[in-house]
Amino acid sequence: MGQNPKRLLKRAEFLAVRRGEKRRGRFFLVEVLDRGDGGVPRVGYTVTKKVGNAVVRNRVRRRLKEAVRVHAADDMVPGNDYVIVGRDDALRAPFGQLKAELSRRFRGTR
């Protein structure tokens, strides 16, 4: 089992990851930036107001965080930063499908 990723917390960290690779999925967009230091992967979550009100956005964020925690963290590459931009489909997707999609995007496969 891999180590748990750290969190991206500062706006500057989120903006830096935007310069990296974008991996589009049905339930979310994953932005990836290789820091080049081989350290613990870091992850940040964001859900835009387009998805819904605060309750809906928080539910989407919680589902994504749990999917990363229980399953997809093992597929994160050390030294990478990830920003997961949630979409409203992430709320209705079966949890197993959400986990599998996250793992695929972290590995960089379609």
Swiss-Prot record:
Known catalytic reactions: Endonucleolytic cleavage of RNA, removing 5'-extranucleotides from tRNA precursor
InterPro entries: Ribosomal_Su5_D2-typ_SF (IPR020568), Ribsml_uS5_D2-typ_fold_subgr (IPR014721), RNase_P (IPR000100), RNase_P_CS (IPR020539)
The enzyme's E.C. designation: 3.1.26.5
Record has RNA-binding as a keyword: yes
SUPFAM superfamilies per record: Ribosomal protein S5 domain 2-like
One Pfam family here: Ribonuclease_P
Disulfide cysteine pairs (residue numbers): none
Molecular function (Gene Ontology), one example: ribonuclease P activity
Functional description taken from the UniProt entry: RNaseP catalyzes the removal of the 5'-leader sequence from pre-tRNA to produce the mature 5'-terminus. It can also cleave other RNA substrates such as 4.5S RNA. The protein component plays an auxiliary but essential role in vivo by binding to the 5'-leader sequence and broadening the substrate specificity of the ribozyme.
Descriptive protein name: Ribonuclease P protein component
Species for this entry: Mesorhizobium japonicum (strain LMG 29417 / CECT 9101 / MAFF 303099)
Gene assigned in the entry: rnpA
